[in-house]
Amino acid sequence: MLQFKLVLLGDSSVGKSSIVHRFVKDTFDELRESTIGAAFLSQSITIHPNDGNETKDVVIKFEIWDTAGQERYKSLAPMYYRNANAALVVYDITQEDSLQKARNWVDELKNKVGDDDLVIYLLGNKVDLCQETPSTETSPDSNEGGDEEQKVRAISTEEAKQYAQEQGLLFREVSAKTGEGVKEIFQDIGEKLYDLKKDEILSKQNRQIGGGNNGQVDINLQRPSTNDPTSCCS
Protein backbone atom coordinates (compact mmCIF):
# COMPACT_ATOMS: atom_id res chain seq x y z
CA MET A 1 0.00 0.00 0.00
CA LEU A 2 1.26 3.47 -0.91
CA GLN A 3 0.62 6.43 1.40
CA PHE A 4 0.38 10.01 0.16
CA LYS A 5 -0.38 13.27 1.96
CA LEU A 6 -3.03 15.48 0.36
CA VAL A 7 -4.14 18.97 1.42
CA LEU A 8 -7.21 21.03 0.47
CA LEU A 9 -6.85 24.78 0.09
CA GLY A 10 -9.33 27.50 -0.77
CA ASP A 11 -11.35 30.27 0.77
CA SER A 12 -14.20 29.73 3.19
CA SER A 13 -17.50 28.35 1.84
CA VAL A 14 -16.14 27.01 -1.47
CA GLY A 15 -16.97 23.46 -0.35
CA LYS A 16 -13.63 21.90 0.61
CA SER A 17 -15.01 19.92 3.55
CA SER A 18 -18.03 18.82 1.53
CA ILE A 19 -15.76 17.43 -1.19
CA VAL A 20 -13.73 15.45 1.36
CA HIS A 21 -16.80 14.06 3.11
CA ARG A 22 -18.35 13.10 -0.21
CA PHE A 23 -15.18 11.16 -1.05
CA VAL A 24 -14.55 9.57 2.37
CA LYS A 25 -18.10 8.98 3.65
CA ASP A 26 -20.26 9.53 0.54
CA THR A 27 -22.37 12.06 2.45
CA PHE A 28 -23.37 15.70 2.00
CA ASP A 29 -24.54 18.07 4.74
CA GLU A 30 -26.20 21.34 3.71
CA LEU A 31 -25.54 22.78 7.17
CA ARG A 32 -21.90 21.77 7.59
CA GLU A 33 -20.05 24.16 9.89
CA SER A 34 -16.83 25.86 8.82
CA THR A 35 -13.61 24.02 9.58
CA ILE A 36 -11.60 25.38 12.51
CA GLY A 37 -7.86 25.16 11.90
CA ALA A 38 -7.77 21.88 9.98
CA ALA A 39 -9.45 18.49 9.95
CA PHE A 40 -7.83 15.14 9.20
CA LEU A 41 -9.42 12.22 7.34
CA SER A 42 -8.10 9.24 5.42
CA GLN A 43 -9.38 7.05 2.61
CA SER A 44 -7.96 4.40 0.29
CA ILE A 45 -8.49 3.78 -3.40
CA THR A 46 -7.28 1.20 -5.90
CA ILE A 47 -5.65 2.15 -9.18
CA HIS A 48 -4.72 -0.12 -12.07
CA PRO A 49 -1.39 1.05 -13.54
CA ASN A 50 0.06 -0.70 -16.55
CA ASP A 51 3.76 -1.37 -15.97
CA GLY A 52 5.02 -2.64 -19.29
CA ASN A 53 2.81 -5.53 -20.34
CA GLU A 54 1.39 -6.13 -16.88
CA THR A 55 -1.62 -4.43 -15.31
CA LYS A 56 -1.81 -4.73 -11.53
CA ASP A 57 -3.86 -3.35 -8.67
CA VAL A 58 -2.18 -0.80 -6.42
CA VAL A 59 -3.79 0.40 -3.19
CA ILE A 60 -3.22 4.05 -2.32
CA LYS A 61 -4.06 5.55 1.07
CA PHE A 62 -4.62 9.30 1.13
CA GLU A 63 -3.93 11.15 4.38
CA ILE A 64 -6.13 14.21 3.85
CA TRP A 65 -5.77 17.57 5.57
CA ASP A 66 -8.80 19.84 5.10
CA THR A 67 -7.69 23.37 5.98
CA ALA A 68 -9.87 26.24 7.19
CA GLY A 69 -10.54 28.97 4.65
CA GLN A 70 -11.16 31.88 6.99
CA GLU A 71 -8.57 34.64 6.85
CA ARG A 72 -7.64 34.24 10.53
CA TYR A 73 -6.48 30.67 9.89
CA LYS A 74 -4.59 31.33 6.67
CA SER A 75 -1.23 31.57 8.44
CA LEU A 76 -1.61 27.93 9.53
CA ALA A 77 -1.87 26.58 5.99
CA PRO A 78 1.92 26.13 5.44
CA MET A 79 1.98 23.68 8.35
CA TYR A 80 -0.19 21.35 6.30
CA TYR A 81 0.89 21.85 2.70
CA ARG A 82 4.66 21.99 3.28
CA ASN A 83 5.30 18.26 2.74
CA ALA A 84 2.13 17.32 0.85
CA ASN A 85 2.25 15.17 -2.26
CA ALA A 86 -0.87 16.77 -3.74
CA ALA A 87 -2.98 19.88 -3.21
CA LEU A 88 -6.61 20.42 -4.16
CA VAL A 89 -7.22 24.13 -4.72
CA VAL A 90 -10.98 24.70 -4.66
CA TYR A 91 -13.05 27.62 -5.93
CA ASP A 92 -16.79 28.31 -6.23
CA ILE A 93 -17.95 28.66 -9.84
CA THR A 94 -20.84 30.92 -8.75
CA GLN A 95 -18.60 33.55 -7.10
CA GLU A 96 -16.84 35.97 -9.43
CA ASP A 97 -13.75 36.54 -7.27
CA SER A 98 -13.33 32.91 -6.25
CA LEU A 99 -11.02 31.88 -9.09
CA GLN A 100 -8.65 34.78 -8.39
CA LYS A 101 -8.43 33.66 -4.77
CA ALA A 102 -7.63 30.14 -5.99
CA ARG A 103 -4.89 31.60 -8.19
CA ASN A 104 -3.40 33.21 -5.09
CA TRP A 105 -3.26 29.81 -3.40
CA VAL A 106 -1.56 28.29 -6.44
CA ASP A 107 1.01 31.10 -6.47
CA GLU A 108 1.70 30.54 -2.78
CA LEU A 109 2.17 26.80 -3.30
CA LYS A 110 4.56 27.30 -6.19
CA ASN A 111 6.56 29.98 -4.36
CA LYS A 112 6.85 28.20 -1.03
CA VAL A 113 6.77 24.51 -1.97
CA GLY A 114 7.64 24.31 -5.66
CA ASP A 115 5.84 22.08 -8.12
CA ASP A 116 8.50 19.64 -9.33
CA ASP A 117 6.74 16.64 -7.79
CA LEU A 118 3.70 18.32 -6.21
CA VAL A 119 0.43 17.53 -7.97
CA ILE A 120 -1.88 20.57 -7.92
CA TYR A 121 -5.53 20.04 -8.86
CA LEU A 122 -7.75 23.06 -9.56
CA LEU A 123 -11.37 22.27 -8.69
CA GLY A 124 -14.45 24.30 -9.57
CA ASN A 125 -17.16 23.25 -7.12
CA LYS A 126 -20.98 23.67 -7.05
CA VAL A 127 -21.82 22.84 -10.67
CA ASP A 128 -25.20 21.62 -9.40
CA LEU A 129 -26.18 25.16 -8.39
CA CYS A 130 -25.87 27.09 -11.61
CA GLN A 131 -27.46 27.63 -14.95
CA GLU A 132 -24.99 28.26 -17.74
CA THR A 133 -26.25 31.74 -18.72
CA PRO A 134 -28.64 34.27 -17.20
CA SER A 135 -32.27 33.62 -18.11
CA THR A 136 -33.91 36.39 -20.18
CA GLU A 137 -37.36 35.49 -18.94
CA THR A 138 -38.31 34.38 -15.46
CA SER A 139 -41.54 32.56 -14.85
CA PRO A 140 -43.10 32.87 -11.39
CA ASP A 141 -43.53 29.10 -11.43
CA SER A 142 -40.04 28.34 -12.75
CA ASN A 143 -38.79 27.13 -9.35
CA GLU A 144 -41.98 25.31 -8.41
CA GLY A 145 -41.10 22.05 -6.73
CA GLY A 146 -37.45 23.03 -6.43
CA ASP A 147 -35.70 23.23 -3.08
CA GLU A 148 -32.72 25.29 -4.17
CA GLU A 149 -32.38 28.59 -5.98
CA GLN A 150 -30.43 28.30 -9.21
CA LYS A 151 -27.47 30.63 -9.59
CA VAL A 152 -25.75 32.06 -12.63
CA ARG A 153 -22.32 30.68 -13.41
CA ALA A 154 -19.81 33.44 -12.67
CA ILE A 155 -16.65 31.63 -13.85
CA SER A 156 -16.61 29.89 -17.21
CA THR A 157 -15.15 26.45 -17.67
CA GLU A 158 -12.96 27.78 -20.48
CA GLU A 159 -11.38 30.51 -18.33
CA ALA A 160 -10.48 28.14 -15.51
CA LYS A 161 -9.34 25.38 -17.86
CA GLN A 162 -7.05 27.74 -19.77
CA TYR A 163 -5.49 28.97 -16.53
CA ALA A 164 -4.94 25.38 -15.36
CA GLN A 165 -3.25 24.46 -18.64
CA GLU A 166 -0.98 27.51 -18.47
CA GLN A 167 0.07 26.60 -14.93
CA GLY A 168 0.42 22.86 -15.49
CA LEU A 169 -2.46 21.98 -13.15
CA LEU A 170 -5.00 19.20 -13.29
CA PHE A 171 -8.52 20.61 -13.64
CA ARG A 172 -12.08 19.44 -13.09
CA GLU A 173 -15.48 20.87 -12.22
CA VAL A 174 -17.40 18.94 -9.58
CA SER A 175 -20.41 18.90 -7.30
CA ALA A 176 -19.88 17.86 -3.71
CA LYS A 177 -23.66 17.80 -3.32
CA THR A 178 -24.42 15.28 -6.07
CA GLY A 179 -21.00 13.61 -6.08
CA GLU A 180 -20.40 14.47 -9.73
CA GLY A 181 -16.69 14.14 -10.51
CA VAL A 182 -15.54 13.69 -6.90
CA LYS A 183 -14.29 10.09 -7.08
CA GLU A 184 -12.54 10.88 -10.35
CA ILE A 185 -10.46 13.58 -8.61
CA PHE A 186 -8.76 11.07 -6.36
CA GLN A 187 -8.34 8.47 -9.10
CA ASP A 188 -6.62 11.12 -11.23
CA ILE A 189 -4.33 12.10 -8.36
CA GLY A 190 -3.49 8.51 -7.48
CA GLU A 191 -2.54 7.68 -11.06
CA LYS A 192 -0.53 10.90 -11.47
CA LEU A 193 1.39 10.36 -8.23
CA TYR A 194 2.11 6.75 -9.11
CA ASP A 195 3.57 7.83 -12.44
CA LEU A 196 5.67 10.56 -10.79
CA LYS A 197 6.94 8.26 -8.03
CA LYS A 198 7.21 5.01 -9.97
CA ASP A 199 11.00 4.69 -9.72
CA GLU A 200 11.01 5.53 -6.00
CA ILE A 201 8.16 3.09 -5.38
CA LEU A 202 9.92 0.22 -7.15
CA SER A 203 13.19 0.96 -5.35
CA LYS A 204 11.54 0.93 -1.91
CA GLN A 205 9.55 -2.18 -2.74
CA ASN A 206 12.71 -4.03 -3.76
CA ARG A 207 14.54 -2.96 -0.59
CA GLN A 208 11.69 -4.10 1.65
CA ILE A 209 11.28 -7.41 -0.15
CA GLY A 210 15.05 -7.91 -0.15
CA GLY A 211 15.03 -7.34 3.59
CA GLY A 212 12.76 -10.31 4.11
CA ASN A 213 9.37 -8.61 3.99
CA ASN A 214 7.36 -10.97 1.81
CA GLY A 215 3.95 -9.78 2.96
CA GLN A 216 2.16 -6.52 2.24
CA VAL A 217 4.59 -3.71 1.53
CA ASP A 218 3.56 -0.33 3.00
CA ILE A 219 5.40 2.66 1.56
CA ASN A 220 5.01 6.20 2.89
CA LEU A 221 5.88 8.63 0.10
CA GLN A 222 5.23 11.89 1.94
CA ARG A 223 7.56 14.63 0.75
CA PRO A 224 10.48 15.29 3.12
CA SER A 225 10.39 18.50 5.12
CA THR A 226 12.84 19.87 7.67
CA ASN A 227 11.52 21.19 10.98
CA ASP A 228 8.00 20.13 10.00
CA PRO A 229 5.58 21.34 12.70
CA THR A 230 3.05 18.64 11.77
CA SER A 231 5.48 15.76 12.18
CA CYS A 232 4.10 14.99 15.63
CA CYS A 233 0.57 14.45 14.40
CA SER A 234 0.60 13.54 10.71
Swiss-Prot record:
Key word Phosphoprotein present: yes
Its membrane topology: Lipid-anchor
Sites of Phosphoserine modification: 139, 142
Crosslinked positions (Glycyl lysine isopeptide (Lys-Gly) (interchain with G-Cter in ubiquitin)): 151
Lipidation (S-geranylgeranyl cysteine): 232-233
Residues that hold GTP according to the record: 10-17, 66-70, 111-114
One CC-aspect GO term: plasma membrane
Keyword Disulfide bond part of the UniProt annotation: no
Self-association state and partner proteins as the record states: Interacts with ROY1, YIF1, YIP3, YIP4 and YIP5.
UniProt function note: Required for transport in the endocytic pathway and for correct sorting of the vacuolar hydrolases suggesting a possible intersection of the endocytic with the vacuolar sorting pathway. May be involved in recruiting the MON1-CCZ1 complex to membranes enriched in phosphatidylinositol 3-phosphate (PtdIns[3]P) or other charged lipids, leading to recruitment of YPT7.
Similarity-based family: Belongs to the small GTPase superfamily. Rab family.
Protein name: GTP-binding protein YPT52
Species of origin: Saccharomyces cerevisiae (strain ATCC 204508 / S288c) (Baker's yeast)
